Amino acid sequence: MKILKITGVPEHFNYPWVKVVESQPFLDRGTRLEWIEESRGSGQMNKALRANETDLAIVLTESFLKDFEAGNPSKIIGFHVNSPLVWGIHMHAQSQINSLKELKEHNFLISRIGSGSHLMSLVLAERENWDAEKLSFSVIDNLPGALQAMDATNPELFLWEKYTTKPWVDRVELKRIGEVPSPWPCFVIVATKASLDKFGVLIMELRNLIYDFSQKLQTDPATVETIAREYNLQETDVRDWLNQTKWATNERVSMTQLGQSMEHMKRLGILNSKPEPADFLTVQNLTLTD
């Protein structure tokens, strides 16, 4: 029996993966799916892809493209979420700071270098006209690490998906002082070269099962209640999140949008240059559009 390992963050975006893996659709073909939760985010998943510790990973777009440029040989087999990710801008709940304009220095808690929490600070700096060269970063691994590291007297910012942190904001364990959306589709499905060689077309069949499941979720009236229960979220929050979220439901990739996204990443310093799409996309398994 072959084991196909899939890694993603333990967040509501990945509910389609959790359910498809539970169904084990390829047992009769000698392949068992294994879902691995990685709370430390995209930077850690890029590391796992490089080390062949996972076969697939659901990674933030900007984080994978930066790591690809740095030598990660894995490839994007499709998008998972086509809409932007809305990042909450958080501080210690008892901090006296209530707005970004009150900050004199711009210090960030991040899961790791190259993660979304790191790279989105550059997006925020551009929006707020901060000097990106003067940003400082402390690595804290994940959300629990941020909660432990925060100090009410030290105004450090922590960027994390808005609805994932909402329960802590509601309990006044975190303070959210703003939001910043990613300027591009947020999640890509990435496969290692070894997994593409080992599993072949089955990986694309799995991707298409995810697309089918995601399509059903977006039209199923029970989705709000189901995701709220699975991830301990309020139904009103899930409903708001679903209204601004668009899961990918097919293998199409807009080359215009991708090009504009990479140009923006280059301007921010996330990328040094725009890589050729044929180098990081499995173009033979995708439908490329204008």
Protein language model features and the residues they cover:
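Phosphate-coordinating loops and pocket residues in cytosolic domains that bind phosphorylated ligands
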Residues: 105, 170, 282
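Pocket-lining segment of extracytoplasmic ligand-binding domains
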Residues: 142-228
